[in-house]
Amino acid sequence: MNTQQLAKLRSIVPEMHRVRHIHFVGIGGAGMGGIAEVLANEGYEISGSDLAPNAVTQQLTELGAQIYFHHRAENVLNASVVVVSSAITADNPEIVAAHDARIPVIRRAEMLAELMRFRHGIAIAGTHGKTTTTAMVTSIYAEAGLDPTFVNGGLVKAAGTHARLGSSRYLIAEADESDASFLHLQPMVAIVTNIEADHMDTYQGDFENLKQTFINFLHNLPFYGQAVMCIDDAVIRELLPRVGRHITTYGFSDDADVRVSGYRQVGAQGHFTLERKDKPLLTVTLNAPGRHNALNAAAAVAVATDEGIDDEAILRALERFQGTGRRFDFLGEYPLELVNGQSGTAMLVDDYGHHPTEVDATIKAARAGWPDKRLVMIFQPHRYTRTRDLYDDFAHVLSQVDVLLMLDVYSAGESPIPGADSRSLCRTIRGRGKIDPILVTDVDTLPELLSQALRGEDLILVQGAGNIGKLARKLADSRLQPQISE
């Protein structure tokens, strides 16, 4: 952003008084790094710490941020404020030092709320679909020439980054319910894609508590704000009478304000019609597969229509949509002759989905777009608590693929829970008689096990939220050939 653009932005968004140096503890996460990137481009001095370098820390370093790959008290001593990731514990030496030095320590969402305070905020919440919907809204606003600021939990492929500082009054952000920190946000528009039982430790295992928290989030909207909600979701439909704000609904349901109809999928593209009240029909070509992505697009269109964005810009943005990182991310198609001597090819797709509903949506999109391909899934369960709480749902959904290779649970810092491990889940799936899953206890053996499982005209889904994304990239780099991958 040049000096003239920054001056224009400052007329909308004033500087934070007494804040020059902002330190992030856990800066390598997509959400933390995205906020740091926006603030760096606003001219603040940025530093941060994490345990290992990654693409996020590399990008921030190129913007002039000072990144430490250790947690030490001295890292924070010159900071005006310290922003902390939800993954960081209170005994972290940087947090202790900041408190001792009377430096304010705030959560990530509090800083995001500050970025949103003087802007027209659009916050996207929900159990599933937040990241993709955030990217779709961003793409439409960018196509319309509105140059929004955005902060997303995943890579926006068209922009090549998780976040970007725009020159307009618009801020589009993913809102995280996992630790209830989205209650800090006070947007003008809020999307809720769906509500399911997830992150239940945050809500004391009480689903009513989770539902009320979403209501409280929506009541952070001003009385003239807009709630955009998916009426196909049974929980959302139940909650509608309790939302005391203007509501626009969307979905496949007949009573949706923005209604998806005539959906069909050809390869990776969805084709459908959007019906809007008192507006022309939109005939949409969406460059993203699956009925779930048609719903995400409908939410984005509802917001854009309310803002008065031209229909042509909306349609162009959806047809050109490049997606987000690790959301049905096509990595390549490789001949099997060099992999295992078989004829035919195998497509490789990487996907972040780690909840049964998300995995089911990904499987359905794969089946609809490539009905003649055999579906081979490499799945890494994420968290023992989630595996325990949704055990039967996982067993049902994972039984729908043709071949299943399952890695050990990615713990995300949790202690093992008896009966909520990958071996138990494989045993349960095998007992249901549809498929015989392969338990992969040593990740180094996966390329060879995968090569033995491929038969030609396969679609490989690498599925999960842990470190499995790195494995997907290794498989792509090796073109699925086990001798190179090892």
From Swiss-Prot:
Catalyzed reactions: UDP-N-acetyl-alpha-D-muramate + L-alanine + ATP = UDP-N-acetyl-alpha-D-muramoyl-L-alanine + ADP + phosphate + H(+)
Any idea where this protein resides? Cytoplasm
Gene Ontology molecular-function annotations = ATP binding; UDP-N-acetylmuramate-L-alanine ligase activity
Q: Which keywords fit this entry according to its UniProt record? A: ATP-binding, Cell cycle, Cell division, Cell shape, Cell wall biogenesis/degradation, Cytoplasm, Ligase, Nucleotide-binding, Peptidoglycan synthesis
Q: Which Gene3D superfamilies match?
A: Mur ligase, C-terminal domain, Mur-like, catalytic domain, NAD(P)-binding Rossmann-like Domain
Give the source's domain of life in one word: Bacteria
One GO biological process term: cell wall organization
List cellular component terms (GO).
cytoplasm
State where ATP binds: G126, T127, H128, G129, K130, T131, T132
Instruction: Give the matching InterPro entries.
Output: Mur-like_cat_sf (IPR036565), Mur_ligase_C (IPR004101), Mur_ligase_C_dom_sf (IPR036615), Mur_ligase_cen (IPR013221), Mur_ligase_N (IPR000713), MurCDEF_pg_biosynth (IPR050061), UDP-N-AcMur_Ala_ligase_MurC (IPR005758)
Q: Give, as in the UniProt entry, the pathway in which the protein acts.
A: Cell wall biogenesis; peptidoglycan biosynthesis
Which Pfam families would you find in this protein's record? Mur_ligase, Mur_ligase_C, Mur_ligase_M
Q: What is its EC number?
A: 6.3.2.8
This protein's major location comes to cytoplasm
Q: Which family does it belong to?
A: Belongs to the MurCDEF family.
Q: HAMAP family from the entry?
A: MurC (MF_00046)
Q: Which PANTHER family match?
A: UDP-N-ACETYLMURAMATE--L-ALANINE LIGASE (PTHR43445:SF3), UDP-N-ACETYLMURAMATE--L-ALANINE LIGASE-RELATED (PTHR43445)
Which function does this protein serve? Cell wall formation.
Q: What is this protein called?
A: UDP-N-acetylmuramate--L-alanine ligase
Give the source species.
Pectobacterium carotovorum subsp. carotovorum (strain PC1)
Q: What is the lineage of its organism?
A: Bacteria, Pseudomonadati, Pseudomonadota, Gammaproteobacteria, Enterobacterales
